[in-house]
């Protein structure tokens, strides 16, 4: 038996369980530890029986509860090395100085300087090779923005993620900042190279998205193949090849193009979502389903639907029309993954 349960899918958090009788893998941990535990129990999955967490990429909606959950359950996490490093950078607390804070600090320093005794014999002026000499004032160093949590959200959360909500439920809040990125065990994999966890063979494949080293997955066990491909700007040839002959196909149907273009997002965000490293639209998925899709899957799960720029009815209608236009594909069942509650388990 191979079973797939989508715990959550969308711009606010993503997580899926792929399991057999002896092995259970969590794909992404994009909800808080508290919420992940709640949804695992609601879906009939025992969290204590998870054998590991595999990560697609480091955006917040895929890793929010990762560290706390992994430590609580004492299970390994599987990343690409680049994704792990990007996640560590994102999780590491940084002191960020706004321009207003810098001005306030400069004012305080100027006041202190005016009260301090001045030496009677002043030294030379700044040298010619220095265009500006800062005398006793703190320098303002703008810092890089933290990686945005998801391509589909116009607002970026600055700084490291909050852990207090999880800490109250799953563990004590770490006192040492290094604890934020401590994991029980880390296993690296490479896109295109298979690896095994228990009796599940995992094939990661590269996908086009604005992250460090994003991947999709095909999980195979007992002759059954389950594919997960979300957060991709378009379906590249390697992804199309990986998705062939899969019994379950979980694939992105993120936005309706008209809703996105007419919606409230800033134009820069709209461009990013529609770019080749953004998210797959209903229209782009329909083109794949009518063209390169082999019709093999018993179930097609539409995932990562935008709450702002899509409607479940639009996504389902678009996919069903695409599938219904080809006679060999009439046996495909279309399901919608939800943000607020787990999807009914798919058992093969």
Give the predicted meaning of each segment.
Residues 33-84:
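Active-site metal-binding motif and surrounding structural segment of the metallo-beta-lactamase
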Residues 64-73, 89-94, 310-317:
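Metal-dependent catalytic neighborhoods of phosphoester/phosphodiester hydrolases
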Residues 332-348:
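Short, basic/aromatic-enriched C-terminal tail that caps enzymatic domains
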Residues 27-30, 50-58, 78-81, 227-230, ...:
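Active-site neighborhood of phospho(di)ester-bond hydrolases with catalytic His/Asp-centered motifs
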Residues 50, 183, 246-247:
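Short, well-ordered alpha-helix to beta-strand connector turns
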Residues 237-337:
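Cap/insert and terminal regions of metallo-dependent hydrolase folds
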């Amino acid at each position: 038996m191979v079973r797939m349960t989508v715990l959550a899918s969308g711009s606010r958090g993503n997580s899926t369980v792929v399991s057999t009788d002896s092995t259970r893998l969590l794909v992404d941990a994009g909800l808080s530890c508290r919420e992940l535990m709640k949804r695992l129990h609601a879906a009939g999955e025992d969290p204590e029986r998870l054998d590991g967490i595999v990560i697609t990429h480091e955006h917040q909606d895929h890793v929010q509860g990762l560290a706390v959950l992994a430590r609580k359950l004492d299970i390994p996490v599987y990343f690409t090395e680049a994704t792990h490093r990007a996640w560590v950078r994102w999780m590491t607390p940084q002191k960020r100085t706004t321009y207003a804070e810098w001005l306030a600090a400069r004012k305080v320093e100027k006041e202190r300087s005016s009260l301090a005794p001045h030496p009677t014999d002043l030294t030379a002026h700044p040298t010619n090779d220095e265009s500006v000499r800062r005398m006793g004032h703190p320098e303002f160093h703008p810092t890089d923005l933290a990686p945005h949590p998801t391509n589909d959200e116009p607002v970026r959360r600055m700084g490291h993620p909050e852990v207090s909500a999880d800490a109250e439920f799953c563990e004590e809040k770490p006192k040492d900042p290094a604890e934020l990125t401590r994991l029980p065990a880390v296993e690296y994999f490479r896109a295109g190279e298979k690896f095994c966890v228990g009796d599940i063979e995992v094939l990661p494949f590269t996908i086009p998205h604005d992250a460090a080293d994003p991947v999709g997955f095909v999980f195979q066990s007992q002759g059954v193949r389950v594919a997960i491909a979300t957060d991709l700007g378009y379906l590249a040839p390697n992804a199309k090849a990986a998705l062939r002959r899969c019994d379950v196909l979980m694939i992105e149907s993120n936005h309706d193009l008209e809703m996105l273009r007419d919606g409230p997002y800033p134009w820069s965000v709209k461009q990013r979502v529609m770019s080749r490293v953004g998210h797959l639209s209903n229209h782009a998925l329909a083109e794949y389903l009518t063209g390169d899709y082999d019709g093999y899957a018993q179930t097609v799960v539409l995932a990562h639907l935008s709450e702002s720029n899509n409607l479940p009815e639009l996504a389902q209608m678009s996919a069903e029309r695409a599938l219904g236009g080809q006679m060999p594909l009439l046996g495909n069942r279309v399901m919608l993954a939800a943000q607020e509650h787990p999807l009914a388990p798919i058992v093969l």
